[in-house]
Amino acid sequence: MIKQRTLKRIVQATGVGLHTGKKVTLTMRPAPANTGVIYRRTDLNPPVDFPADAKSVRDTMLCTCLVNEDDVRISTVEHLNAALAGLGIDNIVIEVDAPEIPIMDGSAAPFVFLLLDAGIEELRTAKKFIRIKETVRVEDGDKWAEMRPYNGFKLDFTIDFNHPAIDASTQRYKLDFSAESFMSQISRARTFGFMRDIEYLQSKGLCLGGSFDCAIVVDDYRVLNDDGLRFEDEFVRHKMLDAIGDLFMCGYNIIGEFTAFKSGHALNNKLLQAVLAKESAWEFVTFEDEAKMPVAFKAPSTVFA
């Protein structure tokens, strides 16, 4: 039987909030089977929980935010959510003493490191997957995103940036998903932004934690970071990282093929909600026989070592 996963122990780290620029303490705790992914703000009294849920995603301008019925929000969850998807973690409580998850280095890699450091525990309950049965597509102008049936998890993402630092040959990336491919090819790709946009936002009291330490920063001509890019096509790889985190907002790994052109947080979430709203397009599945599970979701030896 393919089992649900959680952490073996509590793990904690500190970082800086992208929006506030203030120190954030992040604590990740093991959780029982069928808990799901719970984000919790402990800076509020009483603490407020935000279960990962596609319908709770309401603000996607600069990041992915979860917003509850009282309009209380928690921001910048997408990179940590991508790390959870990458390692197939089903049950976890994530606490922060701030209104946002720390940005760390702008990628998912620090979260992957923390989760592996905590260790991953298999529970005695079957892991549920969402299997795509019908093609679902959403559009917004010339942007689009699509999910179709596939026995695994495959992603094909294309961006369209007219910028000297982003060569035309590096604007499309394809991935046959697995924990190994996510960790090696996707998790280290950082978020990116224009220096002029960061300066403007900071003048308005926003993006106060934005810096060269947590993003690829470009001007009109080049990448400004001293250490350059981690991958030649780091920009599109990061957009794929965002999509993996956005699609895992349902709390389940998806068995299907995701294809997108110029998609972002809002369109990724629109696709996820469109899939879930069409009952004939998907089904829950479990695997009693490991041999029948798509290889995409087999845990690498490093996860349970």
Swiss-Prot record:
Task: Name the gene.
Answer: lpxC
Q: Where is the active site?
A: 265 (proton donor)
The record, for Pfam families, names:
LpxC
Identify the Gene3D superfamilies for this entry: lpxc deacetylase, domain 1 (3.30.230.20), lpxc deacetylase, domain 2 (3.30.1700.10)
Swiss-Prot/TrEMBL cofactor(s):
Zn(2+)
This protein's pathway: Glycolipid biosynthesis; lipid IV(A) biosynthesis; lipid IV(A) from (3R)-3-hydroxytetradecanoyl-[acyl-carrier-protein] and UDP-N-acetyl-alpha-D-glucosamine: step 2/6
The reply on keyword Lipid metabolism is yes
Task: Tell me the lineage of the source organism.
Answer: Bacteria, Pseudomonadati, Pseudomonadota, Gammaproteobacteria, Enterobacterales
Tell me, in a sentence or two, what this protein's role is.
Catalyzes the hydrolysis of UDP-3-O-myristoyl-N-acetylglucosamine to form UDP-3-O-myristoylglucosamine and acetate, the committed step in lipid A biosynthesis.
Q: What class of enzyme is it?
A: hydrolase
Query: NCBIfam families recorded for this chain?
Result: lpxC
Q: Name one GO molecular function term.
A: UDP-3-O-acyl-N-acetylglucosamine deacetylase activity
User: Which UniProt keywords are given for this protein, alphabetically ordered?
Assistant: Hydrolase, Lipid A biosynthesis, Lipid biosynthesis, Lipid metabolism, Metal-binding, Zinc
Q: Which reaction does it catalyse?
A: a UDP-3-O-[(3R)-3-hydroxyacyl]-N-acetyl-alpha-D-glucosamine + H2O = a UDP-3-O-[(3R)-3-hydroxyacyl]-alpha-D-glucosamine + acetate
Q: Which residues bind Zn(2+)?
A: 79, 238, 242
Look up the EC number in the record and give it. Answer: 3.5.1.108
- Ranges annotated as spanning the membrane: none
A GO cellular component annotation in the UniProt record: membrane
GO process terms (BP): lipid A biosynthetic process
- State the family named in the UniProt similarity comment for this chain: Belongs to the LpxC family.
The name on file for this protein is UDP-3-O-acyl-N-acetylglucosamine deacetylase
